[in-house]
């Protein structure tokens, strides 16, 4: 009996020992840390595009910053001087009266300087003031008495065909004087060097440009407009809007305005009309044009017309809307300066 009891006690002891060992193993398993593989996340660096620069007079974006000084050239707009060379490269074209209702063109080149510009024509005092405000290097051939004094006193950096005819300025055999004076890009640059003029851009206009042409489509529909200087059809401009390109073509007497250098039509993103006082000052019909006081204006872009104002902002004629610079569509602009008499109501008409 006693021997059997010992056997049972031994069996119980063995079972208890086994149970304790199993419990310890379970506890060990519970406390043993489980190592998990960590997923390595590699953050991709954002791909940066090239830095873009906005051209000061067109608002067009480019990978190259243009710091070239602007050049302003007086270009002949007589019918015998058409088509003109270089106007397709102008950032801005100003058209305004020179004698009576005969207009001249002031072509502003900053983004591009064409290989040839012309025919070059004579200066007026208000042309020189416009150049001064833009800090542009001014190119003309001839001058009115007031403009002559300003240019000879170096009111603006300039070269004139009266001093450089046959050297910097060349005569075309295709046309007769005064419709045949031209200047090349190389000679403009040579003229800047000869007159010790700066070649660097120093004046930035207060122009404002839209991000998208779609943002411009607020106003009256105007797919065609006509701008008149008196009743002479030779100085009446007709513009038609090309919705596919988002630009205007210009015509005079049914002939499309092209650049003679490449025979391509001049394409414009904005047409501006500035109304101001004009006064005839001599028997030749020369004008005094008020470019200081500001006044009423009209803006045509994206097939839309808007009533605006204009002001002389630091010497630069600037379109304004509700007290701030009017937003333009990026691209080239043609500015018509017309007389308050008869006014824009007569000088400008447009149709949907």
Regions found by a protein language model. Name each.
Residues 1-9:
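Bacterial N-terminal signal peptides that target proteins for export
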Residues 15-19:
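C-terminal motif of bacterial Sec signal peptides marking the signal peptidase cleavage site
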Residues 28-46, 53-68, 72-90, 99-352:
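A surface/extracellular/periplasmic glyco- and lipid-processing/surface-interacting theme
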